[in-house]
Curated annotation (Swiss-Prot):
Organism (species): Stutzerimonas stutzeri (strain A1501)
GO terms, molecular function: nickel cation binding
Entry's Gene Ontology cellular component terms: cytoplasm
InterPro entries named among the record's database cross-references: UreD (IPR002669)
Pfam families: UreD (PF01774)
Name under which the protein is recorded: Urease accessory protein UreD
Subcellular location: Cytoplasm
Physiological role: Required for maturation of urease via the functional incorporation of the urease nickel metallocenter.
Keyword match Chaperone: yes
UniProt keyword terms in alphabetical order: Chaperone, Cytoplasm, Nickel insertion
Family under the similarity heading: Belongs to the UreD family.
Subunit structure: UreD, UreF and UreG form a complex that acts as a GTP-hydrolysis-dependent molecular chaperone, activating the urease apoprotein by helping to assemble the nickel containing metallocenter of UreC. The UreE protein probably delivers the nickel.
Primary gene name: ureD
Xref: PANTHER family: UREASE ACCESSORY PROTEIN D
Length: 277
């Protein structure tokens, strides 16, 4: 009999609340409150004062059963924040669920780039994620999410536990995107052609705006080692992919970001230095 345990025996209850305001031509972090092991490093301005970059860190290094992470981010009118992470978020095997609640609020004229590195869900983990994004007026969003199930390189398939995620995006209180996923360990969808088709990594990119046909085709023609595509919806671009490795997935998303950021946000893509460490 296998007992599901992990050395991180305390149940972490962590909260992080961030707020940004535009002052003149600069975006300034005006709220940074945390409790438990969730925090941000010093704010950075690699592109100048208009774009404030923060790296969200979770010092325990992983999320175990009973843990709860609550993250709330608010951008005031005209602010621009870019949020990323220093490495993969790891959800460990556990006998009880662990939770993450993410709330992102972007006021008119503001821009949020949510660009974390991948989420690795170990076999027998019970990961439950809920994300709510509120856009107001002409607020702009560039969001992605990468999920890796199991650890194939270590010979570990996702054969127990579950991954559950919900994503709601609203603009001016009107629902413009709703998605709900639940994948159980050893689920037939893991290998089904209408599911993950034997791949262990999947990702979604959602950006606000409209693309012209030429740029859409350029994005679709990017060389990559993933199976992916883009769709233009009213006011949203949605990209999805399946892959065997998170590294390939991340490379594809970054290539898309390099093409899309100038067109949608009016700035050339400057990759965060943390991605290269």
């Amino acid at each position: 009999m296998t007992v599901l345990t992990h050395p991180f025996t305390p149940h972490w209850q962590a909260e992080l609340e961030l707020g940004y305001t535009r002052i003149g031509d600069a975006t300034r972090p005006v709220l940074r409150r945390h409790s438990g092991p969730l925090r941000v490093q010093k704010h950075l301005y690699p592109e100048g004062s208009e774009v404030c970059q923060h790296i969200i860190v979770h010092p325990p290094g992983g999320i175990a059963g009973g843990d709860r992470l609550d993250i709330s981010v608010t951008l005031g009118p005209g602010a621009w924040a870019q949020l990323t992470s220093p490495g993969a978020a790891k959800w460990y095997r556990a006998a009880s669920p662990a939770f993450q609640d993410l709330q992102l609020r972007v006021e008119a004229g503001a821009t949020l780039e949510w660009l974390p590195q991948e989420t690795i869900v170990y076999s027998a983990a019970q990961a439950e994620l809920n994300t709510r994004i509120e856009l107001h007026g002409d607020a702009r969003l560039f969001y992605w999410d990468i999920v890796a199930l199991g650890r194939p390189a270590a010979g570990e398939r996702f054969d127990a536990g579950h991954f559950q995620a919900r994503l709601d995006i609203r603009r001016d209180d009107r629902l413009i995107w709703h998605e709900r996923q639940r994948i159980a360990g050893a689920d037939a969808l893991l290998d089904s052609p209408i599911g993950l088709d034997g791949r262990s990594v999947f990702a979604t990119l959602i950006a606000s705006g409209e693309l012209d046909a030429d740029l859409l085709e350029r994005c679709r023609g990017l060389p990559s080692r993933v199976r992916g595509d883009l769709t233009q919806l009213p006011g949203l671009i949605v990209a999805r992919c399946l892959a065997d490795e998170a590294l390939h997935t991340r490379a594809w998303l970054i290539d898309l970001w390099r093409l899309l950021r100038p067109a949608l946000l009016g700035r050339e893509a400057v990759p965060p230095r943390i991605w290269s460490t």
